[in-house]
């Protein structure tokens, strides 16, 4: 029979080992089998094994947490890069808007606010532009301007936080706003229909369409002095292009419903104009003897 303990192999004590110590360490022993032989393990060895197992478990758990954190950071950075690429692709087609984004002025203002918080930074961006895609674009410009500025490391970290937050929470909103900007900008150049309501109406139609009554109500509120017929035509063209780019799926079905409803609104608008004209005809007294009621 083989005996194992934490001081020696076999029953013979090591050189200069005190016998009474060795015997006291083998008082509590565990009997078992190892490769066909009987094995005795002293209690001190069992405790050492347990301690090592606990330590190894802790190390692996710690490494797993670090790995998970790194993976989350990598995913967040990838999301920011994806959104940034699409924003640059679409907004670069409207250089007039990019010229309004004075990053150096923004950097100068923020660098004088060492204790600015994330919510304050977002509020400041919203004050510069109500469009999320433009806010994201400004943040990207700030991030690039802060490279090589170690004295503004706190601001650089804050900007990175804001980019990750916007990409994760408003990614689709940002991309849709950027995607429709070139067409919306051209439509707004007539001076009748403003740019931002055009972007908002398109985005709502894609992300959260609430039905024909809701969109008609939105059109009335957002374009009180605008040309609603031209807005409907603008939406039809934009959504039809989106529809053609989608091969199948629920998104395609939803777009089809919105486009059909817009056509109904267009026809309704035409009838509404006729009714208004008819009513004006009578109100001006051009009845030729015909009574309105």
Swiss-Prot record:
The entry's keywords: Calcium, Cell outer membrane, Membrane, Plasmid, Virulence
Protein name: Outer membrane protein YopN
Compartments (UniProt record): Cell outer membrane
Family per similarity comment: Belongs to the HrpJ/YopN family.
Species classification: Bacteria, Pseudomonadati, Pseudomonadota, Gammaproteobacteria, Enterobacterales
Alphabetical list of NCBIfam families matching this protein: LcrE (TIGR02568)
Stated role: Plays a major role in regulation of the low-calcium response. Seems to sense the calcium concentration and to transmit a signal to shut off yop transcription when the calcium concentration is high.
Keyword tRNA processing: no
One Pfam family hit: HrpJ
Species in which this protein is naturally found: Yersinia pseudotuberculosis serotype I (strain IP32953)
GO biological process terms, semicolon-separated: negative regulation of protein secretion; protein secretion by the type III secretion system
InterPro entries: HrpJ-like, T3SS_LcrE
Gene Ontology annotations for the cellular component aspect, listed alphabetically: cell outer membrane; cell surface
């Amino acid at each position: 029979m083989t005996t194992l303990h934490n001081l020696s192999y076999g029953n013979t004590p090591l050189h200069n080992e005190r016998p009474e110590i060795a015997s006291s360490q083998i008082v509590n022993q565990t009997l078992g089998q190892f490769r066909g032989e009987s094995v005795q393990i002293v209690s001190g060895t069992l405790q050492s094994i347990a301690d090592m197992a606990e330590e190894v478990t802790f190390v692996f758990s710690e490494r797993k947490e670090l790995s998970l954190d790194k993976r989350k950071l990598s995913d967040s950075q990838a999301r920011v890069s994806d959104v940034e690429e699409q924003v640059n692709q679409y907004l670069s087609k409207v250089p007039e808007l990019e010229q309004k984004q004075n990053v150096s002025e923004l950097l100068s203002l923020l660098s004088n606010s060492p204790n600015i918080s994330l919510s304050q930074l977002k509020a400041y961006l919203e004050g510069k532009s109500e469009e999320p895609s433009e806010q994201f674009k400004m943040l990207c410009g700030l991030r690039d301007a802060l490279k090589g500025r170690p004295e503004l490391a706190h601001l650089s970290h804050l900007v990175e936080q804001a980019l990750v937050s916007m990409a994760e929470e408003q990614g689709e909103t940002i991309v849709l706003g950027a995607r429709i900007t070139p067409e919306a900008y051209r439509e707004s150049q007539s001076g009748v229909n403003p740019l931002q309501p055009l972007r908002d109406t398109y985005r709502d139609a894609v992300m959260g369409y609430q039905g024909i009554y809701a969109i008609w109500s939105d059109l009335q509120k957002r374009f009180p002095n605008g040309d609603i017929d031209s807005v409907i035509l603008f939406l039809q063209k934009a959504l039809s292009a989106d529809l053609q780019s989608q091969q199948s799926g629920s998104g395609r079905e939803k777009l089809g419903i919105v486009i059909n409803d817009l056509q109904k609104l267009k026809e309704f608008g035409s009838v509404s104009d006729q009714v208004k004209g008819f009513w004006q005809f009578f109100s001006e007294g051009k009845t030729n003897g015909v009574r309105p009621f």
